Amino acid sequence: MAGGNFRYSLAVFNSGSQLLHETLIKPDWLPALEAARFQALCSVGSISGKETISPSWHPSCGQPYISGVRACVNVGSNGEGAIDIPMTYFRPHADAVVTALVQSGALVEGEQILYSVSAFLVPDEPVTEKLSYGSLSVERQCPLRGARSIAEFECNIKATIGSGGANFPVFIPKAILDEAEALKEGAGDVETGGIVIGHLWQDPAAGPFVVVTAFIPARHTLAEKTRLTFTPETWADVNAAINLRTAGESYVGWIHTHPCRVWCHCPEPEKKVNCGYSLDFFSTTDAYLHRCVFYGAHQIAVVLGDRFLSGKGWKTTYSGYGWDHGIIVSRQFYITDGSVERQSFEKRETNGKTTAG
């Protein structure tokens, strides 16, 4: 970081503002910097430059207390991409402390807590941890495919899935969700899933949007009732499928299932309707995989779960997730009839054919 290096300290208080624990933390800055890269991509068309994380000092408490941080990618004379990261970015660190306090008996489970974060300048300490502290200058592959009109896809919207807002539109053909649901039904009592590939486009007027073009079922996985593990063979298989398509597609996210009807042991239909397992959720294991593989600010996740409807039995549900300010949140997706995606692929296939004379 220009001017020095910052260390961050987390303090956790009970509802009576009594300090329970204070500790140094090492935030994972990659999602925050990905959010800044996405801003740079949308505003100046580049993601390569000097990357910084700087504290945003608390407006009333002042230094060393912060209200968040500012992630920035400076691409030189072309400009920069910057985004303000809120305090909720540090919530996982607070949750980890709370878990330890509950286990030690210092805090009652369910008790409300407060937390604060402070930043301290350490000017003479060298930067040693990539994406933890300081400034970085890296070369990255640009995920933007090019310019395209979003109107082509908006006119084919048939429905929406997921809840919450959306910092950019995502279009998914219904046929892809049908494929995923068929995979879910065939998996029985274990989780299953796959990778969704497609393109990140930029509409000159409306901004960026993602188009999902295909679903690649994940093979060579370790599937359990409450966990799906992708192996090196899984990723090799997916990459081979992408290369065979030769459509310039890239990972835009993943789909996996929560077989809630298997998890639910409620004896009566009325209790099944309100079963906690049937609620939409993105587990800590899900979040870990998303962070490790799908950390790009434009990359998304879809979860197929189950909900019990009185008189109708179990029904598949869809929930959507994605990045917003470096944090995984619930979000909405548009479901299309897939006609534009299909026509584009068929046109490319036709143009790629060679006729022997």
Model feature map: region roles:
Residues 1-251, 259-357:
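Conserved beta-strand-loop surface patch within small alpha/beta domains used
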